[in-house]
Amino acid sequence: MIATEYPRPPLAGIDWNHLGFEPVEVNGHIESRFSPSTKTWSTPTFIPDPYIRIHGLTPALNYGQQIFEGLKAFRTPSGSITVFRPDQNAHRFARSARAVSIPPIPTDIFLEAVHLAVGMNSEFVPPVGTGAALYIRPLAFASSATVGLALASEFLFCVYVLPVAPLHKHSGENDKDRKKRGVRALVVEDFDRAAPRGTGDVKVGGNYGPALGRIDAARQEGYGLTLHLDSQSRSLVDEFSTSGFIGVRKENDDELKLVVSDSQQIVASVTIDSICEIARGFGWAVEKRSIAFTEVSEFVEVYAAGTAAMLVPVQSVERRSTGEFIQYSVDYAEPTSVFAQLYKALSGVQQGLVPDQWGWTQEVLRPKQLASQDTEADT
């Protein structure tokens, strides 16, 4: 028997330099089911298609009892494939599950499913040097049928993958201008993303569905980002619709300081946590605290940060109700900009271009299921 090459090389026929953020047909997805009798999740299984058959009266479809995650895998110069900080996503996924009464997926099951999804679709991991990645979307939901507002007994955990470009690569600016000046941001003022003591700090669809129309409307006007303020006072920065907020201050002695929000209504960002660690390694200060909107004009650089977006420089922030228009004149493409230094360091670790001194990446080894397919093909 001749074993299939692993990792498989990038699939021919895909234009890796011009990916978007839309689904691509891959080999399949992963499923694990929760047993109400044993109170355990099953061993993750590879399903060779993208479809799920469920009852139309599940609490997931009717009452929003569902959660999701997002992380990425990269192909490295050595030829291996790695996933970036999946353990942190596992912890966040479990926290989201508890928030909507879904049995938390154990970390080992989560990691096994993620590694299996990537390994069984290794030819869809983009080549080195394209800036693209394999986006990984874990999701879980109540799958048993019930019309009444009662706890479900059955649940399904899935992991999907798709090759993608950075989320805001095509956000109204041409690529050259986006890298140099950043994207425009608009403050959302007719809608509160999350309520105090609500679900803003977990990844549930209800936090995102109502924002979709506003994101699209802003995009039609040339804004690549929409920014949310706190729902209680509307005076504090919460986060962008798709990612977290980072501001950079330059103190009188030219000391650099990254400022991130400590709001209890936002999702804990793995990307922001990583960027803050990198900044500390550069000797820069990091503050996690409330950010008044009035302070936004005092920052010398501003970014949106998240798994899908990675790190996106912001050109301007506009708040129409007050007529405020805050513009940042920095050349983000300049290698000495704070953005350029952080982006290079983060992408370097993710793509295996620099040593991973933090132990953030996990190599995806050859799945046992792939070996089984080789055996079947040989017989």
From Swiss-Prot:
Top-level taxon of origin: Eukaryota
Keyword Transferase: yes
SUPFAM superfamilies xref list: D-aminoacid aminotransferase-like PLP-dependent enzymes
InterPro entries: Aminotrans_IV (IPR001544), Aminotransferase-like (IPR036038), B_amino_transII (IPR005786), BCAT-like_C (IPR043132), BCAT-like_N (IPR043131)
EC number of the protein: 2.6.1.-
Cofactor or coenzyme needed: pyridoxal 5'-phosphate
Pfam family, one: Aminotran_4
Cited function: Transaminase; part of the gene cluster that mediates the de novo generation of L-homotyrosine from acetyl-CoA and 4-hydroxyphenyl-pyruvate. L-homotyrosine is a building block of echinocandin B, a fungal lipidated cyclic hexapeptide that acts as an antifungal agent. This is followed by isomerization of 2-(4-hydroxy-benzyl)-malate to 3-(4-hydroxybenzyl)-malate by htyD.
Name by which UniProt lists this protein: Transaminase htyB
UniProt organism field: Aspergillus rugulosus (Emericella rugulosa)
Gene: htyB
